[in-house]
């Protein structure tokens, strides 16, 4: 009977509306609505067709973005525009979600609330390779807990040397400036292959007009000649360095020290009496333990270590579908791919290949519009009541026909 089809269709409509309302606070939930179609019956005795009621052909999923709300939590992630987080369960089944509530398990895997693993690319602290999307795997931070030490291989030093210098002077190390316009000396901390910090002395001594000698010596209390090198510098009348500005520092103990270059690019000779070291740095550092990490918009996980160094320790990759409306909804606010949705396309990084970008410390709330759902509920309820009345009327007509006998 036609009225029964209306009752069934609107009952299903009410269930869809109720489910939307129930999930109005579910993170990453996408609202749904039915697609109604009218049914016809064909007569065998004529070319006419008669209405035969209504049905629901499919349920449409609304993948418009929900609003992002700040949480302040490092592992809360929202997606701006298109894309899904890719998850895998313990049996290897792949799912997709917009729910960005993640946690660290005891093995330091990034998981969702059901314990499924967030997938992407892993990297060690010594090597980063994010160019292979074929090897998506659960993101694990355990191997990134320690950043190995890096021995010093380059010292960068830029000094302004006073061309009026005639004799030695002392150095006030408190402000790194000379007490008198004479010879110059500074201490630089470097790191050996064991990650230990040691000081070396770099001094500049004037030989004659426009010519200087730079001396590099170890301050090792056991052997002050472990590092002991001298290099000649030549300047033109404008104070510009005309000789080599990069030198190789040699050591008596190659097992202890890396090959080190001394880069004096930018060092000049000038007439001013007040001299300072404009640049004074080196590229080594000690071993460090992971303190915090931050997830940036392109999905890179940046670790910060106790030695103040930062390192990319992982990469979250988002997946896209040609037809996301045809994804199969699963319990737990998940979806799985279908033939109609197409295969997932994984971007190299969030924000490229038309992929969405990540928003750290935020969550995407449900895109359910409660006002619309309440209006739809009233409409569905009236439709249901109207079809119920039609059913009663049809029933009376049938009873009347039966009683005519």
UniProtKB/Swiss-Prot annotation:
It is found in: Bacterial flagellum basal body. Coiled coil: none annotated. GO terms for biological process: bacterial-type flagellum-dependent swarming motility. The gene is flgE. SUPFAM superfamilies: Flagellar hook protein flgE. Pfam families: Flg_bb_rod (PF00460), Flg_bbr_C (PF06429), FlgE_D2 (PF07559), LlgE_F_G_D1 (PF22692). This is Flagellar hook protein FlgE. Its main location: other.
């Amino acid at each position: 009977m036609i009225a029964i089809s209306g009752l069934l269709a609107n009952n299903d409509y009410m269930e869809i509306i109720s489910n939307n309302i129930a999930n109005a606070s579910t993170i990453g939930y996408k609202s749904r609505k039915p697609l109604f179609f009218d049914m016809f019956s064909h007569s065998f005795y004529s070319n006419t067709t008669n209405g035969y009621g209504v049905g629901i052909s499919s349920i449409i999923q609304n993948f418009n973005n929900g609003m992002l709300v700040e949480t302040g939590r490092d592992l809360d992630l929202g997606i701006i525009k298109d894309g899904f987080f890719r998850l895998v369960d313990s049996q290897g089944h792949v799912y997709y979600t917009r729910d960005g509530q993640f946690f660290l398990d005891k093995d330091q895997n990034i998981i969702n609330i059901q314990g499924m693993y967030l997938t992407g690319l892993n990297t060690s602290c010594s090597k980063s390779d994010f160019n292979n999307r074929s090897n998506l795997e659960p993101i694990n931070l355990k191997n990134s807990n320690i950043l190995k030490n890096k021995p010093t291989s380059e010292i960068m030093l830029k000094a302004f040397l006073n061309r009026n210098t005639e004799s030695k002077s002392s150095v006030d190390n408190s402000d790194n400036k000379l007490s008198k316009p004479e010879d110059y000396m500074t201490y630089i901390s470097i790191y050996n292959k064991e990650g230990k910090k040691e000081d070396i002395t770099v001094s500049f001594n004037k030989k004659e007009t426009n010519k200087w000698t730079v001396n590099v010596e170890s301050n090792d209390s056991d052997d002050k000649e472990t590092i002991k090198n001298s290099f000649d510098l030549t300047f033109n009348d404008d104070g510009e360095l005309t000789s080599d500005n990069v030198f190789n520092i040699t050591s008596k103990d190659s097992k202890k020290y890396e090959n080190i270059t001394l880069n004096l690019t930018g060092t000049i000779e000038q007439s001013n009496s007040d001299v300072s070291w404009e640049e004074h740095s080196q590229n080594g550092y000690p071993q460090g333990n992971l303190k915090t990490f931050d997830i940036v918009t392109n999905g890179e996980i940046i670790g910060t270590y106790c030695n103040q160094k930062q390192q990319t320790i992982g990469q979250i990759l988002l997946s896209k579908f040609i037809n996301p409306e045809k994804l199969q909804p699963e319990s737990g606010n998940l979806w799985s791919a279908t033939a109609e949705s197409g295969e997932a396309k994984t971007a190299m990084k969030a924000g490229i290949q038309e992929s969405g970008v990540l928003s750290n410390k935020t969550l995407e709330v449900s895109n359910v519009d409660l006002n619309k759902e309440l209006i739809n509920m009233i409409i569905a309820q009236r439709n249901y009541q109207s079809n119920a009345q039609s059913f009663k009327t049809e029933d009376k007509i049938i009873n009347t026909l039966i009683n005519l006998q």
